[in-house]
Amino acid sequence: MSRIGKKPVELPSGVSAAVSGQTIEVKGPKGARSFTATDDVTITVDGNVVSITPRGMSKRARQQWGMSRTMVANLVAGVTEGFKKELEITGVGYRANAQGNTLKLNLGYSHDVDFTVPAGVTVSTPKQTEIVVEGIDQQQVGEVAAKIREWRSPEPYKGKGIRYKGEFIFRKDGKKK
């Protein structure tokens, strides 16, 4: 029995869901998203409640049951509130500037890094040392934030680089005399 899968997903006001076959489409104030489940589960919409049930009790069906329920819950959260990842830049001369769908990064290289932001995600820079990635697709927001962080991940000696807000960087001592 999946403890996650057996909980139904409630649809808040202003959000609608429609099921056709194995695909559920959720529409809300921030946009629309869809998810196609495997044949191991059945998705049903009753009023403002979405419930997922397994078609059998095989190990795969139970795994897909909990995963499908979480994916539908993420669809609902995305179209109502959206998802957000915040990044901090640490280092002398390291800064970021968002211009349209391009993020310009000065990260100590001999050239500026121009990062093109994909559709469905918005990137803003409230300060030169902060980057905010927002969107309705949790996976895409996390992927864009990870790609930005990849350009200069934090190093353990001085802590310079791009880190997630609140991320702990394990620090090392330098050489000892």
From Swiss-Prot:
Q: What does this protein do?
A: This protein binds to the 23S rRNA, and is important in its secondary structure. It is located near the subunit interface in the base of the L7/L12 stalk, and near the tRNA binding site of the peptidyltransferase center.
User: Which Gene3D superfamilies does the protein's record reference?
Assistant: Ribosomal protein L6, alpha-beta domain
Query: Which PANTHER family does the protein's record reference?
Result: 60S/50S RIBOSOMAL PROTEIN L6/L9, LARGE RIBOSOMAL SUBUNIT PROTEIN UL6M
The family database entries (Pfam families) matched by this protein are listed as: Ribosomal_L6 (PF00347)
Keywords noted in UniProt: Ribonucleoprotein, Ribosomal protein, RNA-binding, rRNA-binding
One GO BP annotation of this record: cytoplasmic translation
Question: Which protein, by its recorded name, is this?
Answer: Large ribosomal subunit protein uL6
* Alphabetical list of InterPro entries matching this protein: Ribosomal_uL6-like (IPR000702), Ribosomal_uL6-like_a/b-dom_sf (IPR036789), Ribosomal_uL6_a/b-dom (IPR020040), Ribosomal_uL6_bac-type (IPR019906), Ribosomal_uL6_CS (IPR002358)
According to the record's subunit comment, the protein's assembly and interactions are:
Part of the 50S ribosomal subunit.
* Classification via HAMAP family: Ribosomal_uL6_B
- A Gene Ontology molecular function term of the record: rRNA binding
Q: Which domain of life is it from?
A: Bacteria
Annotated signal sequence is none
Q: Which GO terms describe its cellular component?
A: cytosolic large ribosomal subunit
Q: Which family does it belong to?
A: Belongs to the universal ribosomal protein uL6 family.
Q: What is the species listed in this Swiss-Prot or TrEMBL entry? A: Ruegeria pomeroyi (strain ATCC 700808 / DSM 15171 / DSS-3)
The protein's matches in PROSITE patterns, at most eight in alphabetical order, are given as: RIBOSOMAL_L6_1
